[in-house]
Amino acid sequence: MNRPIVLLVEDETSVVAFIQSALERYGYCVEAAASGAQALEMLRDRSYSGVISDMRTPGGVDGAGVWSWIAGHRPELLRKLIFITGDIVNEETAATLRRTCAPFIEKPFRVHQLISTLEQVLGQRQ
């Protein structure tokens, strides 16, 4: 059986290492993009089972920009995107979460929260 491939959009290397290690322990393959712009390049070139994106990333394309691109180019991934954020009180972040209806996890989070949410959006149980 092929392992699900998840695109992780996160610029903090310690968070990337934490999430990648956790997801790999649960049988996922993780490819990381350090910016929203890099994520869009990767989404153009490869298929993913799901996407986990930080709301705030450098390079001019944030989590909302990744969501918008997916909506226009890879709509099959819209319901398979999870936002992670440390800033839900920010009005722009809150507005994006309301507009997209995408599931989100607030930093800091526990591994079981991430795995449970990922299993829900991918429609599988580990």
Regions found by a protein language model. Give the residues of each.
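Two-component/phosphorelay signaling modules centered on CheY-like receiver
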Residues: 13-31, 102
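Acidic, metal-coordinating helix/loop segments flanking the phosphotransfer/catalytic sites
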Residues: 7, 20, 32-50, 58, ...
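The C-terminal output helix
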Residues: 119-126
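Conserved acidic carboxylate
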Residues: 10
